């Protein structure tokens, strides 16, 4: 069994064969899924490297536990204690290499319509050579001339790409909310229990959102300070209430019969999350107390002195952040989700079946399996045509690379950025997250009113 598996992996690394696991008892995997998983693996590998580069804790641990650390840095000409391989400038250079890698493949795979051509073969295989190319791109960033000028220009390129990635992410969320309601509403036509599921989930989502708002009023407002927090909490809460009423208004339901409260519940919960994230990223405020002196107000409890919790919260927050990035990069390129980048159409497929995990349903039909000797079976689902846009897939990962770069280096507060201080306050991060909440609400309101404004374009 070992020899056939090695041959299969060699064909994957050095040829156009799809990658698969060596264990034959593993579930079948589609070629399109295998390819996207491998690119996601590349992406996460570089992302973890960037996190390590921004962590003084990891740098100190390596210095203490690797006996030849100083000698290795000297051999690599990386400066004293590898100073050129850590910090925000190193992250900029590594992410520049990853962005160049995905941008090249985005251009290389333009208008690829089937998997039989040589460009599709390169996209779906030759993983060893692509891994070497990725390493070369990331290393090449350290040899660019005019480093200071490069970092200055690349910072603004990264900010523009990061903003565009945020917009795509928000459009995906709006499309996800519509698809969820559409899928479960279709189930109610043959099983009324789906109505109960809709009502229960809607109630839970609104309850969590309201609870989150109460929590923020408790911890992020103060009678004598934090007036900006009060304004934004009131504005976002009011906007969420307005879009919820708008979603069930007769004028909207005339053009979108499936519009209900589930979509605004999803949007409201996400807006409350963005609001919380923005307020948590805001610089701390202090007021003068007659008894205690200057005290910190409008912060989460762990920021008031319980520093032992900071690393835990930062670690969990970072993990959630990168999971969301990875989900956005992978899901945005499927045929179903690519509709999110267009104006939403309220058309119900005739064969729509309600599913609890509807978002993971493949766009492809059943295909014949191709046996992989000694390993996992692969379904070559792209023989008749591609099931996702190769070019757009790489473009989203290109934008994701820029978003990771800006997030890990704390956007425009990069000089003293550390991964352990990812959740500490800065005005740039605050305004980015607060603006994201408004953009999300705008996108959802637009999908509600545009069929009413342009009815001729949305007729079945």
UniProtKB/Swiss-Prot annotation:
Keywords: Antiviral defense, Cell membrane, Glycoprotein, Immunity, Innate immunity, Lipid biosynthesis, Lipid metabolism, Membrane, Phospholipid biosynthesis, Phospholipid metabolism, Transmembrane, Transmembrane helix. Coiled coil: none annotated. InterPro entries: TDE1/TMS. Glycans are attached at residues 114, 183. GO terms for molecular function: phospholipid scramblase activity. One of its GO terms (cellular component) is membrane. It is a multi-pass membrane protein. Residues 1-36, 111-124, 178-197, 252-259, 333-391, 455-460 are extracellular. It catalyses: a 1,2-diacyl-sn-glycero-3-phospho-L-serine(in) = a 1,2-diacyl-sn-glycero-3-phospho-L-serine(out); a 1,2-diacyl-sn-glycero-3-phosphocholine(in) = a 1,2-diacyl-sn-glycero-3-phosphocholine(out); a 1,2-diacyl-sn-glycero-3-phosphoethanolamine(in) = a 1,2-diacyl-sn-glycero-3-phosphoethanolamine(out). GO terms for biological process: antiviral innate immune response; phospholipid biosynthetic process; plasma membrane phospholipid scrambling. It is found in: Cell membrane. Its main location: membrane. The chain crosses the membrane at residues 37-57, 90-110, 125-145, 157-177, 198-218, 231-251, 260-280, 312-332, 392-412, 434-454. Residues 58-89, 146-156, 219-230, 281-311, 413-433 are cytoplasmic. Belongs to the TDE1 family. Restriction factor required to restrict infectivity of gammaretroviruses: acts by inhibiting an early step of viral infection. Impairs the penetration of the viral particle into the cytoplasm. Non-ATP-dependent, non-specific lipid transporter for phosphatidylserine, phosphatidylcholine, and phosphatidylethanolamine. Functions as a scramblase that flips lipids in both directions across the membrane. Phospholipid scrambling results in gammaretroviral surface exposure of phosphatidylserine and loss of membrane asymmetry, which leads to loss of infectivity. This is Serine incorporator 5. It comes from Danio rerio. The gene is serinc5.
């Amino acid at each position: 069994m070992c020899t056939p598996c090695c041959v299969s992996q060699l064909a994957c690394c050095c040829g156009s064969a799809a990658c698969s696991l060596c264990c034959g008892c593993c579930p079948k995997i589609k070629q399109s899924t295998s390819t996207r998983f491998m690119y996601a693996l590349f992406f996460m590998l570089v992302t973890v490297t960037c996190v390590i580069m921004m962590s003084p804790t990891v740098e100190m641990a390596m210095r203490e536990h690797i006996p030849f650390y100083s000698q290795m840095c000297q051999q690599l000409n990386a400066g004293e204690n590898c100073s050129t391989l850590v910090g925000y400038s190193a992250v900029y250079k590594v992410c520049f290499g990853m962005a160049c890698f995905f941008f090249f493949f985005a251009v290389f795979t333009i208008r690829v319509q089937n998997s039989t051509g040589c460009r599709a073969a390169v996209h779906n295989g030759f993983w060893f050579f692509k891994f070497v190319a990725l390493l070369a791109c990331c290393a090449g960033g350290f040899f660019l001339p005019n480093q200071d000028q490069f970092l200055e220009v690349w910072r603004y390129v990264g900010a523009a790409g990061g903003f565009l990635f945020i917009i795509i992410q928000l459009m995906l969320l709006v499309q996800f909310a519509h698809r969820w309601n559409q899928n479960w509403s279709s189930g109610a036509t043959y099983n009324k229990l789906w109505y109960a599921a809709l009502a229960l989930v809607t109630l839970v989502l609104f309850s969590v959102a309201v609870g989150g708002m109460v929590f923020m009023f408790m911890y992020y407002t103060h009678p004598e300070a934090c007036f900006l927090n009060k304004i934004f909490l009131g504005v976002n809460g009011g906007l969420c209430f307005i879009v919820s009423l708008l979603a069930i208004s007769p004028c909207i339901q005339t053009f979108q019969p499936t519009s209900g409260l589930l979509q605004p519940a999803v949007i409201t919960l996400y807006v409350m999350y963005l609001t919380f994230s923005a307020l948590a990223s805001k610089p701390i405020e202090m007021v003068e107390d007659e008894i205690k002196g200057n005290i910190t107000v409008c912060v989460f409890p762990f920021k008031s002195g319980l520093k032992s919790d900071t690393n835990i919260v930062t670690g969990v927050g970072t993990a959630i952040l990168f999971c969301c990035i990875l989900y956005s990069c992978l899901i945005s390129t499927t045929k179903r989700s690519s509709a999110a980048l267009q104006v939403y159409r309220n058309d119900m497929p005739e064969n729509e079946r309600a599913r609890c995990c509807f978002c993971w349903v493949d766009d492809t039909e059943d295909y014949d399996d191709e046996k992989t000797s000694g390993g996992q079976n692969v379904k070559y689902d792209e023989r008749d045509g591609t099931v996702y846009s190769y070019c757009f897939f790489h473009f989203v990962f290109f934008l994701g690379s820029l978003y990771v770069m800006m997030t890990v280096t704390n956007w425009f507060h990069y000089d003293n950025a550390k991964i352990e201080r990812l959740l500490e306050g800065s005005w740039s991060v605050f305004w980015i997250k607060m603006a994201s909440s408004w953009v999300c609400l705008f996108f959802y309101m637009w999908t509600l009113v545009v069929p009413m404004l342009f009815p001729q374009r949305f007729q079945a």
